[in-house]
Structure formats: structure tokens, C-alpha cells
Amino acid sequence: MARIAGVDIPRDKRVVISLTYVFGIGRTTAEKIITEAGISSETRVRDLSEDELGRIRDIIDRIKVEGDLRREVSLNIKRLMEIGSYRGLRHRRGLPVRGQNSKNNARTRKGPRRTVANKKK
């Protein structure tokens, strides 16, 4: 397994697919990286030379990925919560942030149902 940005990427897959195992790199970014590095999209990771891996690492070093990206996202959410914006309040309450209906659905964000017992009559 080759290590890129602190992540072991699978050897048997194509380079484009393997790069998506790094947090912050999707298909489009992966394709841009290998084009800039001058590597064929059909190349498998096991066929890469150390020179090609080095070029990929140099390009990825210029992109914010893994820990830095996760830290930035969490700081952005924390900032929204501190300034008291509507989005920050939704994050704090564990509700959907982007305007989705939460009366019936939103179970992923709200968690399992907490049933309330009926009063005795």
C-alpha cells in the first residue's frame, strides 16, 4: 500500500479511485491531480514509480486535505455556533441545518425517537 497524506491507498485500484480514499479528494480533484502529475488515468497504484508518487504527494501538499480540512470544517461550525447564527443554533440543537423539514423526518440528524409516555386519565 502506498501512503499519501497519511492514508494507505489501495494498490490494486486505479490511481484516480485510490486518491479518493484521502479525505478532501473526490473524483474531480483526483483527475486534476493525475493530469497535472502527467499520469495516465488507467494506471494502477502498484505500477507507479517512486518519482510519480513523489509528484502526486507534492501536488496534494498544496491542497488542504485530511486533518487540516477536518479542523477547518469543525472550526467553521464552532464559529457559527459562537456568533449565534441560525445555522449555529441548528448545529447546537442537532437539527438539520439546510432548511429541511424536521416535523416527520430528519431521523439521521435527530437520532432515534424518544417516545413520551401518555398521562393516565
Swiss-Prot record:
Basic residues compositional bias, start-end: 106-121
PROSITE patterns the UniProt entry points to: RIBOSOMAL_S13_1, RIBOSOMAL_S13_2
Region (Disordered) location: 91-121
Pfam family name, one: Ribosomal_S13
InterPro entries to which the protein is assigned, alphabetical: Rbsml_uS13_C, Ribosomal_uS13, Ribosomal_uS13-like_H2TH, Ribosomal_uS13_bac-type, Ribosomal_uS13_CS
GO biological-process terms attached to the record: translation
Gene Ontology molecular function: rRNA binding; structural constituent of ribosome; tRNA binding
GO cellular component term, pick one: cytosol
Record keywords: Ribonucleoprotein, Ribosomal protein, RNA-binding, rRNA-binding, tRNA-binding
Family indicated by similarity: Belongs to the universal ribosomal protein uS13 family.
Assembly information from the UniProt record: Part of the 30S ribosomal subunit. Forms a loose heterodimer with protein S19. Forms two bridges to the 50S subunit in the 70S ribosome.
Matching PANTHER family: 30S RIBOSOMAL PROTEIN S13/40S RIBOSOMAL PROTEIN S18 (PTHR10871), SMALL RIBOSOMAL SUBUNIT PROTEIN US13M (PTHR10871:SF1)
Function: Located at the top of the head of the 30S subunit, it contacts several helices of the 16S rRNA. In the 70S ribosome it contacts the 23S rRNA (bridge B1a) and protein L5 of the 50S subunit (bridge B1b), connecting the 2 subunits; these bridges are implicated in subunit movement. Contacts the tRNAs in the A and P-sites.
NCBIfam families tied to this protein: uS13_bact
Protein known as: Small ribosomal subunit protein uS13
Native source organism of the sequence: Bacillus mycoides (strain KBAB4)
Name of the encoding gene: rpsM
